[in-house]
């Protein structure tokens, strides 16, 4: 099953709290990717970084972009996103907006989500969630 990597996994790697390159190497057979919204979240972090950290964050993100293909947000993803949003909102189990888009991207592409935020993603029916180790 393909694997969509959540921003928190990449951020922990950038902060030295998780060995992202080693873990990604072990996941190579799953075709790890990132959702387009995740790329936006990560670039936002680069843009907000202080001058001291900006170059390092940008270099790390470049490594991520060169390593992980980006799954686009398509019209089909938008429909999955809307359905998921309505279902979670209606059940009172709403999750963060960006997490919702990552989940919709994963469901639409038949992928699992790798995240340290399993509490949110486990609210999504039918979504396989993997906590990296």
Indicate where each model-derived feature is located.
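Active-site neighborhoods of divalent-metal-dependent phosphate/nucleic-acid chemistry enzymes
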Residues: 44-47, 69-116
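Short, structured coil segments at secondary-structure junctions
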Residues: 28, 66, 124-125
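Short, well-structured N-terminal submotif of metal-dependent ribonuclease cores
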Residues: 1-35, 46-63, 133
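Active-site phosphate/pyrophosphate-handling residues
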Residues: 8, 59, 100-101, 128
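Acidic, PIN/NYN-like endoribonuclease modules and their adjacent C-terminal/linker elements
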Residues: 1, 103, 107-133
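Alpha-helix capping/helix-boundary segments
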Residues: 9-10, 38, 77, 102, ...
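Conserved beta-strand termini and adjacent loop/short-helix elements that scaffold enzyme active sites
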Residues: 35-37, 73-75, 116, 130-132
